[in-house]
Amino acid sequence: MGSFFCPYRKICVTLHPCKKNLDVEVQTLHIFNPEHDIALASNLANFTAPHAGRQLRSDLGFLPVLWADEADAVLVDNVEVAARSCQRLCRKMGKTPCRFVDKSQLGHLDIVRIEPWGWDLALRAMLKRNGVSEGLLPSDEQLERIRLLSHRRTSAQLLPLLQMDGTVGEAFECTTTEQVATLKERYGQVVVKAPWSSSGRGVRFDENVAWVANVIARQGSVMVEPYYNKVRDFGMEFESTASGIRFMGLSLFHTRKGAYTGNILATEQAKREQMGRYVSLDLLDAVCLQVVQRLDLDDYRGPFGLDMMVVKGDGGFLLHPCVEINLRRTMGHVALSLSPDDDELVRVMQISYDNRYKLSVRHKM
């Protein structure tokens, strides 16, 4: 299994508005675009995210400072607001904010590469409109491959490769409501998912015919899985590089009604001890090795995560090794950038909403 990676970063400085005709060198431009999953579903260059997605991006746009390097910059809606919003968290975690830039400055930056939360048509169109060189942006063909790999079909295709003693899991792609009804009759209770959707959305725990027909009409199919009695959520975070797939760490996270709410911040050893209460660590290692060796992501380069879960089986627990593949950066990657070195120190990272989104870190009680 690959080694745990926790990118504590160097000190950066806030970038003041650029003077005209003065290029500021930026090694990597980071972008938090959490509406990415919905943008994939729309597949439109002129996509407008729902209000909640736009607000999440605006309120937490500073997040990449947690893993950015000294020569990097983070694209935000408002530079001053982003600098204020991240001050308390950065002080608490011993990090100094990196430089922030807004759209008006993009044409004045000498950018080496761009690392968004996830690539889609809408993001590329926005960057191009604001003066970013086309050579830094993915082609139509690359974006289409990313979109197809982000289809939940990819998870269903990987799942059989991860099956071994102690695991469970099936998933089927259906293109008609009749196929869904047949699976419902076979399994009794099923989960129906849209091929592309954001966290907590596009997932139904029934086979509502009208909803299924609508998703099939818009996205071409739905994914259907047997319902499993979940005990806990977790995931594995990876990075796809030119030399292969690298394991970055475990992600122990919490959800409410399918929507992400927070992560445990702990060392890999502490997280493995927690997971060992449910499933064999040898099984986790074997599944991780299969992902590294057998998952084919074509020419995709960047972070991605596999959502998994522990479920109740006959007389014990079973591992579902691939609930979903997120072909983008995830909150699990964010948690890894904040994880401690001390096995005794365990924190909780949470996202809450009270008129605005906030990310907080507190000690676990």
Q: What kind of region is each of these model predictions?
A:
Residues 25-66:
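N-terminal-proximal low-complexity accessory segments that begin disordered
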